[in-house]
């Protein structure tokens, strides 16, 4: 016997009102605008240090330093070229090493971005232009900056993630 159509419908949590969603969005925008200069500085710093492929020691160190400043535990993979930060329930149990079990993490959301560059000489003339024969022509400096910005906004709401037994991996 086939299940009733109503049994196949996903159960969902109550939806926030449009006004509540707008207020949350407005609050996030205001918070991000408050550190817009820092975001720009991060992007310019990353833009000046383009690295190729999976050899990203400067970029990885830079990301690790920013996560450390935000008190976000992280792990590195792929010879240090991959950095994974944790915010939320999993971070509380990671004890600073950026590693937690699936049970400790609870519900997981993953945000990702690339950090590598292309072997293209930059000729932009910008004061933050790269000078090593490579450049972030594909915007990976912005990927990394956006993730750092998201990390900062999420860290400010970490208690809500812990209460929801959820972890965001960046």
Q: Could you describe each region identified by the protein language model?
A:
Residues 2-136, 141, 145-168:
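Acidic/His- and Gly-rich active-site-bordering loop/insert found
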């Amino acid at each position: 016997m086939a299940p009733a159509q109503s049994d196949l419908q996903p159960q969902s949590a109550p939806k926030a009102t449009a006004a509540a969603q707008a207020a949350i969005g407005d609050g996030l925008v205001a918070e991000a605008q408050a550190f817009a200069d820092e975001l720009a500085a991060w992007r310019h710093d990353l833009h000046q240090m383009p690295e190729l492929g999976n050899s990203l020691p400067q970029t990885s160190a830079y990301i690790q330093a920013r996560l450390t400043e935000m008190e976000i535990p992280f792990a590195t993979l792929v010879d240090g070229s991959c950095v994974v930060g944790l915010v939320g329930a999993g971070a509380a149990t990671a004890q600073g090493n950026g590693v937690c079990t699936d049970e400790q993490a609870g519900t997981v959301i993953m945000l990702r971005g690339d950090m590598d560059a292309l072997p293209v000489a930059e000729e932009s003339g910008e004061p933050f232009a790269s000078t090593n024969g490579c450049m972030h022509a594909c915007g990976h400096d912005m990927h990394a900056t956006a993730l750092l910005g998201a990390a900062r906004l999420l860290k400010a709401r970490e208690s809500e993630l812990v209460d929801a037994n959820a972890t965001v991996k960046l």
